[in-house]
């Protein structure tokens, strides 16, 4: 597991493009036959990807976590971002995940196996884990069951549908919040005007992006912003002090995940567009 350390916003002002990408962009998450993970010191969030093929993949990393099993002091959310079915076995109980299904697994579940139904057409699982203080029940939720919010409009090029899966009024968790947002056709902006939530960090996974299309992800303090050019199935870590917004060369989908102090989705400090530099 790769480890990423936290960054002071004063130091961030001196980063060149290469350093920004090294610290905040996550690529190569989805590798056939493997689980790849990044441990962030922002709220101890783990971001990962799994593409099981011929044999199940076991969610574990004793060396990094120094625990007997992965969820000894953690909770985790899985999303199947592929069109291929997969399944996750939690201490012997099997959960089948179709396209855009989410599975939450709580603290103290010991044996987590990740599999594809068809090894020739493997599922692609996005994984996010946060620290946990108590056990919440394992629960699966489909896109149709998620809480739906319609946001934006065509005039601002930010018309989008946001689906909340793991949150206060959905799947219960200690601190992990996860959901998925779809940009409508001919709409390319997400989270503009932007906001900051100093109580929580956030991670974005951008996907459903054609090979020759890109996302410009904006980050930094409102008066000192930078951009990261993002390709399909790459993730970005967003510090609590940073805005997080993006625009694509075409519409796209992203999964957002948050962890931190407050468990309220709307706890955010809005930034006026005129403040941006």
Swiss-Prot record:
Pfam families found in the cross-reference section: KduI (PF04962)
Entry similarity comment: Belongs to the KduI family.
Reaction it catalyzes: 5-dehydro-4-deoxy-D-glucuronate = 3-deoxy-D-glycero-2,5-hexodiulosonate
Signal peptide span: none
Identification of the protein by name: 4-deoxy-L-threo-5-hexosulose-uronate ketol-isomerase
General function of this protein: Catalyzes the isomerization of 5-dehydro-4-deoxy-D-glucuronate to 3-deoxy-D-glycero-2,5-hexodiulosonate.
InterPro entries noted in UniProt: KduI, KduI/IolB_isomerase, KduI_N, RmlC-like_jellyroll, RmlC_Cupin_sf
Keyword Nuclease: no
First-level EC class: isomerase
Cofactors that this protein relies on: Zn(2+)
Positions that bind Zn(2+): 195, 197, 202, 244
Organism whose genome encodes this protein: Oceanobacillus iheyensis (strain DSM 14371 / CIP 107618 / JCM 11309 / KCTC 3954 / HTE831)
Record-linked CDD domains: cupin_KduI_C, cupin_KduI_N
């Amino acid at each position: 597991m790769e480890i990423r350390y936290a960054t002071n916003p004063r130091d961030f002002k001196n980063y060149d493009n290469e350093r920004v990408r090294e610290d905040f962009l996550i690529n190569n998450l989805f590798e056939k036959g493997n689980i790849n993970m990044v441990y962030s010191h922002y709220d101890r969030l783990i971001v990962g990807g799994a593409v099981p093929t011929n044999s199940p993949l076991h969610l574990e990393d004793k060396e990094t976590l120094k625990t007997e099993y992965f969820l000894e002091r953690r909770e985790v959310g899985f999303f199947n971002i592929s069109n291929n079915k997969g399944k996750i076995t939690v201490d012997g109980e099997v959960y089948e995940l179709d396209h855009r299904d989410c599975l939450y697994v709580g603290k103290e579940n010991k044996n987590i196996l990740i599999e594809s139904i068809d090894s020739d057409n493997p599922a692609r699982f996005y994984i996010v884990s946060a620290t946990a203080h108590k056990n919440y029940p394992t629960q699966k939720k489909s896109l149709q069951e998620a809480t739906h919010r319609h946001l934006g409009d065509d005039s601002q090029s930010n018309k989008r549908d946001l689906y909340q899966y793991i949150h206060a009024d959905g799947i219960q968790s200690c601190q992990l919040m996860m959901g998925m947002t779809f940009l409508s056709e001919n709409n390319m902006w997400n989270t503009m005007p932007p906001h900051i939530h100093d109580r929580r960090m956030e991670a974005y996974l951008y996907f459903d992006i054609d090979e020759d299309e890109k996302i410009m992800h904006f980050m930094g303090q409102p008066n000192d912003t930078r951009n990261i050019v993002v390709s399909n199935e790459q993730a970005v870590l967003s510090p609590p002090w940073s805005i997080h917004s993006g625009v694509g060369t075409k519409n796209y989908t992203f999964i957002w995940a948050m962890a931190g102090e407050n468990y309220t989705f709307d706890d955010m400090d809005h930034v006026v567009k005129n403040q941006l530099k």
